[in-house]
């Protein structure tokens, strides 16, 4: 075969591969999955297990009904507490979709923080800009155009805790069976919650810790939309038993065997999604960063990074 023919064949193969990858990015973004993790609590914490459902980054807009159905279906899973880590809207037209998605979860206890796309609708930009560093929010956009107050009222009406630069301690009902054959009993787990508004647009203010934060019967959770290091460091200093975040989309376009290219914040790319350990000043906290469920309407693609929700079991340390 002549060199020209070889080059022509190679170009054809490369083109076909590119078309295949592009097609798959459209398929994969429509394949949400539920992931499960276990976090072992430190010895000395006198509590029962707590199962947390985390929902991150739905970015709902018309045409995303498959995500609405997926979120609604999560109500059939077994969990005790819901944490919504923000970026619920993909457009103003998605407001009713957000309520419809979360409605079956409203009879469970929960807490929430917001991301920038709960305040400001996304703007069209080149994907390549994400490769040069975290996206920038225009200082000229200082009046939210999304119905964040209405969404906050919707969550609060169900009893969910608004953790916008707030901290609180609550009792979460959990069902446990003490002995095989027993009927389920309702018990309570005391949970300390600390949250901030979106660090990505510099709305974060670390609140004062509530009384009882360090009590021996209290599970401590740190919640943020974007996992910026300054917030993770504060939560780790406060000895959070688990930090929950979203925002990164897991990198959204990943390289198999390498992982995420970017995190859209100052978090190392190796921590773009999943369960890890964050260390600061001699202390450590488990960190779960969700790859999230949605995408911007202007970049509706995923590769090697399926959309996801997560259930994290916080399990008491095994007794010797």
Feature-to-residue mapping (PLM):
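Active-site-proximal beta-strand elements of phosphoester/diester hydrolases
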Residues: 49-59, 188-199, 221-225, 286-292
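Binuclear metal-dependent hydrolase catalytic cores centered on His/Asp/Glu-rich metal-binding motifs
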Residues: 125-160, 164-166, 171-232, 299-302
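Conserved beta-sheet core of the metallophosphoesterase superfamily
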Residues: 227-310, 318-319
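N-terminal active-site segment of His-dependent metallophosphoesterases
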Residues: 15-101, 121
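Active-site neighborhood of phospho(di)ester-bond hydrolases with catalytic His/Asp-centered motifs
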Residues: 54-56, 81-87, 110-116, 163-165, ...
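Membrane-penetrating hydrophobic segments
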Residues: 1-13
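Acidic/histidine-rich helix-loop elements
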Residues: 26, 49-68, 89-91, 120-140, ...
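Core catalytic region of metal-dependent phosphoesterases/phosphodiesterases
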Residues: 66-171
């Amino acid at each position: 075969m002549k060199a020209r023919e070889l080059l022509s064949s190679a170009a054809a193969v490369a083109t076909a591969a590119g078309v295949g990858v592009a097609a798959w990015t459209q398929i994969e973004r429509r394949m949400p999955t539920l992931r499960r993790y276990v976090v072992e609590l430190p010895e000395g914490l006198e509590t029962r297990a707590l199962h947390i459902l985390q929902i991150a980054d739905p970015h709902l807009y018309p045409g995303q009904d498959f995500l609405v159905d997926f979120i609604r279906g999560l109500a059939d899973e077994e969990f005790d507490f819901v944490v919504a880590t923000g970026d619920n809207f993909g457009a103003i037209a998605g407001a009713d979709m957000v309520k419809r998605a979360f409605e079956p979860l409203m009879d469970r206890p929960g807490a929430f923080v917001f991301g920038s796309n709960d305040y400001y609708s996304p703007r069209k930009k080149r994907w390549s800009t994400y490769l040069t560093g975290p996206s920038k929010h225009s200082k000229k956009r200082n009046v939210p155009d999304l119905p964040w107050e209405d969404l906050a009222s919707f969550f609060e009406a169900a009893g969910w805790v608004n953790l916008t630069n707030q901290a609180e301690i609550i009792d979460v009902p959990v069902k446990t069976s003490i002995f095989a054959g027993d009927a389920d009993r309702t018990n309570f787990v005391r949970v300390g919650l600390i949250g901030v508004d979106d660090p990505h647009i510099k709305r974060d203010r670390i609140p004062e810790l509530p009384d009882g934060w360090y009590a021996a019967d209290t599970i401590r959770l740190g919640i943020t939309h974007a996992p910026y290091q300054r917030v993770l460091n504060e939560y780790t200093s406060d000895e959070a038993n688990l930090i929950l975040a979203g925002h990164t989309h897991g990198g959204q376009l990943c390289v198999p065997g390498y992982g995420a290219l970017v995190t859209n914040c100052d978090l190392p790319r190796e921590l773009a999604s999943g369960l890890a350990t964050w260390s600061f000043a001699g202390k450590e906290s488990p960190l779960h960063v969700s790859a999230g469920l949605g995408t911007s309407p202007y970049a509706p693609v995923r590769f090697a990074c399926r959309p996801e929700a997560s259930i994290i079991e916080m399990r008491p340390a095994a007794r010797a």
